[in-house]
């Protein structure tokens, strides 16, 4: 039967290759080229490993944060963080000026390709001579190529960031060895802590001990820095099936757009009063060619006006186009002629203060298109008592009243009188009207009582206004104002008392309350206070403002979002709150998630976990109009040897090899190498090494015999 062994070997290899794990796992990320001139945390004096440099929780920025920014902190000193404030630029793009310790760096996309080790069933990246960006970044310019390891130039100063995800299968672990700083976060928790300037150090994590939920998807974030000559090493071993959840418009996994967009060059609009910014990372950009260019990106850039908030209501703050700086200029309060308002001064809280020009004794205080509305006769009638036997008008001293039925002095015997507003005349006999009254007194009129002259004042002397002193001289009548009221007090024409008049105090600004007040020491003083709009309102979702022309206004409170993933909303009792942004896709096999650095919602294919991750693969079955989606487990075919209980390989097992393997063998035998190569390529078969076949391992169950295990004759 030995003649069958070569054939059996070939068939088993072919079948295993078809269903083996992918031979490589590519992890995409970003390298940030650093230089000691711009960040003195690179190339300091040598150090050693230092734990607890960074916080144990990864924030929404998805980069580590130092525990302390104090350069004299012992941990920072031991970890060779010479200038802790520059740590923020280890894993984030910085387009700072190329000046000493500015933090400037150059972002470069990178792919790490891990190869599958079938014996260990892990993916491995191993490079003990790890210089991935020689002649790139700053080192495009030869003046930066000043560091070497004794045998030649290399770029020794860079930081690597990988922001990925994985769906937990329940069997994962991670192993690392290398230098210098290495931090690994799973589910945003620090699980590998190899900080500091050190030679090769080892770190590992048994993911099954982290309390993760099988089938759930978690973040896997890896951070690595090379900060010192003369060596650079890295080795990763893991069975984590990490994947990239999203790409920026530069094509970088979880990127921020900085590898192909620079806000100062790509997005510069040439205006000093705008803040130029690259598009959000998930922006869909139409490319003119195969490679994205500045010209492609520029239309999607944002240019936000520089904000220059006004310091108060009496000053404007605007951006100076020549400098880009905010410049304050005072407001000019001008007369509002159409409103009959004369500008007086400016109050920082209320704005421009005005005085009405409609304050004359015959002004009503109302302005009509720039003209003061005068008191009408009816207005004066209402003001002075509205006696139907009087005629009312407004004169230079204000409202006045005259008899409706005046006496004619030339006919003293015909006495005029008014009866309920109707003029009548009573004719007197000679004895009643001619009793020796002095005709020379022009301010009196005849009046006889029992043939005795009892003169009466001529009509019109009393104007009915208690605020004037009425006199008659040689028949000339005078109404002199009684100026006994001070400040904003005015005389009441009916009672003659001084009343407080708020009208006098009006300043034409609807945002002030203007009141005439008196105290024991001061009479008639105008007080102006700022209107408190909404003072009694209890609804925290209504906001109030005041317009000096229209007064109090109300509007709904607009609660701002916090970042990209917290949506602002308003609660009438608590005010502004936030809630997580919903990214539900409605499709079972598509997962929606909000990522702060992505600028909002992302969507990626759901990865299903298998019941047994070593022997099965998880498959997602999408929902339909009538059925819900679900995950199912499918056995690997052929089943790996370690997954068979009490498996004994025999010719019967071999005879059960799939038809695909037999067909491949036939093509190989009868078609030669070229025919076989064509068959392989036409099916896009990915081959790993022959040692990926678990049938060449000893039976892990301890029973039965594997005839191909350690049998050199089979090879």
Curated annotation (Swiss-Prot):
Ranges in coiled-coil conformation? none
Q: In the UniProt record, which residues carry a glycan? A: 149, 377, 528, 622
Keyword flag Cell wall biogenesis/degradation: no
Q: Where is this region: Disordered?
A: 690-715
The protein's UniProt keywords, in alphabetical order, are: Glycoprotein, Membrane, Signal, Transmembrane, Transmembrane helix
Segments on the Cytoplasmic face: 673-715
- The stretch of residues making up the signal peptide is 1-20
Q: Listed GO cellular component terms?
A: extracellular region; membrane
PANTHER family, A to Z:
PROTEIN PSIB-RELATED-RELATED, PROTEIN PSIH-RELATED
Which NCBIfam families does this one have?
Answer: Fibro_Slime
Q: Which family does it belong to?
A: Belongs to the prespore-cell-inducing factor family.
- According to UniProt, the name of this protein is Protein psiH
Q: Which organism is it from?
A: Dictyostelium discoideum (Social amoeba)
């Amino acid at each position: 039967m030995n003649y069958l062994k070569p054939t059996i070997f070939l068939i088993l290899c072919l079948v295993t290759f078809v269903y083996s794990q992918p031979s490589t796992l590519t992890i995409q990320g970003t390298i940030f080229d650093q230089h000691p001139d711009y960040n003195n945390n690179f190339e300091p004096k040598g150090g050693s490993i230092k734990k607890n440099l960074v916080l144990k929780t990864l924030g929404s920025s998805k980069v580590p944060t130092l525990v302390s920014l104090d350069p004299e902190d012992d941990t920072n000193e031991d970890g060779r963080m010479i200038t802790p404030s520059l740590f923020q630029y280890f894993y984030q793009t910085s387009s700072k000026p190329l000046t000493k310790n500015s933090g400037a760096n150059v972002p470069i996309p990178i792919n790490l390709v891990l190869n599958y080790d079938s014996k260990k069933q892990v993916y491995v990246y191993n490079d003990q001579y790890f210089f991935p960006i020689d002649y790139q970044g700053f080192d495009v310019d030869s003046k930066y190529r000043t560091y070497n390891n004794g045998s030649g130039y290399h770029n020794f100063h860079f930081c690597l960031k990988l922001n990925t995800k994985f769906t937990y299968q329940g069997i994962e672990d991670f192993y690392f060895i290398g230098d210098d700083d290495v931090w690994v976060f799973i589910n945003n928790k620090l699980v590998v802590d190899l900080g500091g300037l050190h030679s090769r150090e080892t770190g590992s994590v048994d993911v099954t001990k982290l309390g993760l939920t099988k089938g759930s998807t978690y973040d896997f974030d890896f951070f690595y820095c090379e900060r010192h000559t003369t060596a650079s090493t890295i080795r990763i071993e893991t069975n984590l099936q990490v994947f990239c959840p999203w790409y920026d418009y530069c094509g970088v996994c979880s990127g921020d757009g900085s590898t192909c967009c620079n806000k100062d060059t790509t997005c510069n609009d040439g205006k000093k009063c705008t803040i130029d910014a690259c598009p959000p990372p998930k922006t869909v950009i139409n490319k003119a060619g195969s490679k994205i260019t500045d010209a492609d990106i520029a239309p999607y850039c944002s240019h936000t006006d520089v904000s220059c908030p006004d310091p108060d209501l009496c000053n404007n703050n605007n951006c100076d186009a020549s400098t880009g700086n905010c410049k304050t200029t005072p407001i000019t309060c001008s007369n509002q002629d159409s409103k009959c308002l004369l500008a007086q001064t400016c109050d920082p809280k209320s704005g421009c203060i005005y005085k009405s020009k409609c304050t004359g004794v015959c002004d009503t205080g109302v302005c009509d298109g720039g003209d003061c509305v005068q008191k009408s006769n009816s207005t004066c009638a209402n003001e002075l008592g509205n006696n139907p036997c009087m005629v009312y008008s407004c004169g230079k001293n204000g409202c006045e009243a005259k008899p409706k039925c005046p006496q004619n002095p030339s006919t003293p015997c015909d006495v005029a009188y008014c009866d309920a507003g109707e003029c009548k005349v009573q004719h007197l006999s000679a004895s009643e009207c001619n009793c020796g009254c002095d005709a020379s007194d022009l301010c009196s009129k005849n009046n006889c009582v029992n043939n005795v002259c009892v003169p009466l004042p001529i009509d019109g002397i009393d104007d009915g206004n208690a605020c004037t002193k009425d006199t008659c001289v040689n028949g000339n009548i005078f109404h002199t104002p009684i100026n006994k009221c001070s400040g904003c007090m005015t005389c009441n024409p009916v009672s003659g008392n001084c009343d407080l008049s708020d009208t006098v105090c009006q300043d034409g600004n609807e945002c002030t309350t203007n009141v005439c007040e008196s105290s024991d020491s001061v009479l008639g003083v105008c007080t102006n206070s700022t209107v408190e709009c909404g003072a009694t309102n209890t609804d925290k979702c209504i906001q109030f403002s005041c317009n000096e022309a229209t007064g109090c206004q109300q509007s709904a409170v607009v609660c701002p979002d916090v970042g990209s993933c917290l949506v602002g909303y308003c609660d009438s009792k608590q005010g502004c709150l936030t809630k997580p942004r919903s990214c539900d896709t409605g499709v079972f096999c598509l997962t929606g998630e909000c990522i702060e650095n992505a600028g909002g919602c992302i969507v990626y294919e759901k990865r299903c976990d298998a019941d047994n991750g070593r022997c099965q693969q998880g498959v997602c079955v999408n929902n339909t109009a009538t059925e819900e989606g679900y995950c199912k487990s499918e056995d690997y075919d052929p089943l790996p040897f370690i997954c068979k209980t009490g498996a004994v390989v025999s010719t019967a097992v071999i005879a059960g090899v799939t038809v695909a393997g037999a067909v491949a063998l036939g093509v190989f035998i009868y078609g030669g190498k070229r025919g076989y190569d064509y068959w392989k390529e036409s099916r896009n078969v990915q081959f790993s090494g022959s040692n990926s076949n678990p049938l060449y391992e000893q039976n892990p169950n301890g029973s039965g015999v594997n005839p191909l295990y350690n049998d050199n004759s089979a090879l």
